[in-house]
Amino acid sequence: MATVGDLKAVVKDTLEKRGVMGQLKARVRAEVFEALDDRSEPKPVLSPENLLINELIREYLAFNKYSYTSSVLTAETGLSEVPLDRSFLTKELNVVEDLNSQSVPILYGIVAHFLKEHEDGPCQKVEKVSTENHTFRNIPRGRNTKDTHSGPVQLTQTSTEDWHQRRHR
């Protein structure tokens, strides 16, 4: 007859194989955060840039079914429970989409666009700066990022398959 320890190990292994263990841990973290969140303390007003960034992240999280992470983001940032409309985001970001790019988060399309741009032509030399655990890139002095991308960002031929192909080159 199996011991309690054996039964626990089998249940744990089964939950991990089904992907449920990660969901349970995320759910517990989200619930703990919700319980500790002081709703009486007003959240700081988000700048328009932070609002757009948070909405792009929320759309990405929803697409990947990271619902508990999304709920923590919403609670921490004070985002409205109702996301901003995608057409509003694309208009604000000066993004032009095609049918393929509409099936994935805007963030995927933006990253794919800049990766393709990098592949298509020479980039200015970017100096890498290392810290203990991270590497950052410094934009060369005198380079104005507004001069680099003055027109709309054209998001085309972006799909999850395309994204994964680019990632594994």
From Swiss-Prot:
User: Where are the compositionally biased (Polar residues) regions?
Assistant: 151-160
- Coiled coil location: none
Q: Which GO terms describe its biological process?
A: cilium assembly; microtubule anchoring
The chain positions of domain LisH read 49-81
Protein origin, superkingdom: Eukaryota
Q: What is its main location?
A: other
Name of one Pfam family that matches:
FOP_dimer
User: What's the family?
Assistant: Belongs to the CEP43 family.
Q: How does it assemble?
A: Homooligomer; probably required for localization to centrosomes.
* Main function: Involved in the biogenesis of cilia. Required for the recruitment of PLK1 to centrosomes and S phase progression.
Query: By what name is this protein known?
Result: Centrosomal protein 20
Lineage of the native species? Eukaryota, Metazoa, Chordata, Craniata, Vertebrata
Its gene is: Cep20
